[in-house]
Amino acid sequence: MWAGRRAWHCGDVLVRPVPDNAVAAWSAGVLDGLQVEGLRLAHPVRSSDGRWVVAGWAASRYVPGVLEPRYDAVIEAANRLHAATAELTRPRVLDGRDDLLARSAAAAWGERRLSLDPATGGTLYAELAAYRTAVQVTPQVVHAELFGAVLFDGDVPALVDLVPAWRPKEWAAAVVVVDALAWGGADDTLPHRWAHLDEWPQMLLRAALYRLALHAQHPEASARTLPGLERAAGLVTALL
């Protein structure tokens, strides 16, 4: 296991299975040429015939580090990453996606209606969705799953992958906050420390809706796994 992911470490290379070959190949192509000041990247490694993905497997350089509850530093890393990805065009691999993450994000942004189990978050989702209002923010390529993707080994954090979404950078930061509140033991003041970001209350709301929609659809979710998101939702609601 590496950063919570199934992977095999051999020398300075990590080999791991990927859930989507097309997305993994696109992400590898971006990370291969990306340089982000103040952020170490797990650069991808090609196969002997030049491919990024072979039969559902990909490889990257090993970057040392461990997960730490340094959530402000994770958001700072996110902001640096998204400054570097701001000029990327919308990837075609996102077109027509209907996986759990894509459905949940579309629902959170009011682009799709989902039938969600009330017992695993559907009721809370409906309550929060009533607070959603229009926003003026710009979508770009962002990392949609940064919580658990940033490692620390000294002062310079490391990014282990790139899970692309076409959403505002403020939303990606808000997802980190919601995850940290729900599952990372973050203190109640974390959302307030990033209140200078554009449309912040609504970005937090959409991040909470995203996680609630995902939780309510997840096959392993239950009422017992919901309290963390209930805590996060309560703190987000207080800012609306």
PLM segments and residue spans:
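Conserved Hanks-type protein kinase catalytic core
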Residues: R61
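A cross-family kinase active-site recognition segment
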Residues: E68-A119, P164-A165
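Short, conserved active-site entrance elements at the starts or edges of catalytic domains
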Residues: E111-P139
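Active-site Asp-x-Gly
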Residues: D153-W200
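A structured, mid-to-C-terminal "fold-capping" secondary-structure block
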Residues: P191-Q217
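ATP/Mg2+ or Mg2+-diphosphate-binding catalytic cores
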Residues: L214-L240
